Amino acid sequence: MDDDDFGGFEAAETFDGGNGETQTTSPAIPWAAFPTVSGVHLSPPSPEIVLDHDHSSAIDCLSSDAIISSPENTHAENSIVSQTIPKAQIQQSTHTHLDISLFPLGLTDEKSNGTIALVDDSEDPGANVSNIQLRQKISSLEIKLKVSEEEKQRIKQDVESLMEKHNVLEKGFLKEKEQEAISFQDRYKELQEKHKQELEDMRKAGHEALSIIVDEYKHQRLLEMLDTEKELLKGKIKEALIQQSQEQKEILEKCLEEERQRNKEALVSAAKLEKEAMKDAVLKVVEEERKNSEKAHAEERELWKTEHAKDQEKVSQEIQKAIQEQRKISQETVKAAIIEEQKRSEKAVEEAVKRTRDELIEYIKEQKRLDQVIRQRSLSSLELFLSCAQKQLSALIATEPVDIE
């Protein structure tokens, strides 16, 4: 539906007449354009109006038939158009129709600025009569213009009221649709949460069942492996202890033999040193005594013998005492060495047992860690499988139409 259906309010256009003459531009509507003729032109404001008698019939025809329609026809046409035009087109064309004035308003403006002067090259005697008729028609046109202006204002008010009603209805419709969309969205969210919770429950149930089965299997397998490793470690510990005791026994025998040899050599060397020392001392004493005895050889010979016997006795006693002390020291040294060697061997055995126990614990921890890694991998693969299944279920749920009514 174009703009002519709403009363023909549109911008002025220029049309060419059928005889090739340029038509005057109507300020409001295209059908108000009329051809200009020779001797007729617009002039500045003038108190006189001269009309060409030859063209008076054409002007009368235009003024009576084509210049403007009656207020009743305009009102009927506008009422029919207002009933048939959709709301969207009324919105789009409201500003255009309200801003465009009618042709009679243009004539009124022209009249307010100055009167229309129609000048003919040759003056007729009936020009005064035509001027009077033209004045009467102009006055009637002014009355019709006022009526059309009032009709225009009334139409403008009707359009504004219709626009306000349309805006109110549109706001109510949009609010209702927004509330429906919010309710639909809430219901969709509830359904989505429900499906999500059901999928989560299914995933948790499957995960728990699988984790229980895997834990049972791992526990059984770990017990079997621990039993096997325990038997193997018992055999290894027994063999290691036997071998360690044999080695400790051999080392102890070697140490005792070496210690015995060292003690024997030490005793021999000590006896030799003591003997040499005593011999030197005895020789010195003998030399002194010999010198003294040379002076009193006869008297002191007996004394010297007795003293010499005493000295020999003392020397033998000292030698025996030194030998006994050396023997006690050697025995104590051997006992201390044996006790220390026993303690060392016991400590070595304890360290070997502790080291073996630590190695066993480390091995068990390593096995537990490997089992944990395998379990984590299994759980990760299961989690990946369940997430893929959840995505597929979400995709299937999204592709199916949701019954929201």
Curated annotation (Swiss-Prot):
Transmembrane regions listed in the UniProt entry: none
InterPro entries: CCDC91 (IPR034592)
Region (Disordered): 1-27
Phosphoserine PTM sites in chain numbering: 43, 46
Subcellular location: Membrane; Golgi apparatus, trans-Golgi network membrane; Golgi apparatus, trans-Golgi network
Alphabetized UniProt keyword annotations: Coiled coil, Golgi apparatus, Membrane, Phosphoprotein, Protein transport, Transport
Main localization category: membrane
Region called Homodimerization, residue ranges: 210-377
Gene Ontology biological-process entries: Golgi to lysosome transport; protein transport
Residue runs in coiled coils: 126-376
Quaternary context: Homodimer. Interacts with GGA1, GGA2 and AP1G1.
Role: Involved in the regulation of membrane traffic through the trans-Golgi network (TGN). Functions in close cooperation with the GGAs in the sorting of hydrolases to lysosomes.
Protein name, UniProt field: Coiled-coil domain-containing protein 91
Organism: Pongo abelii (Sumatran orangutan)
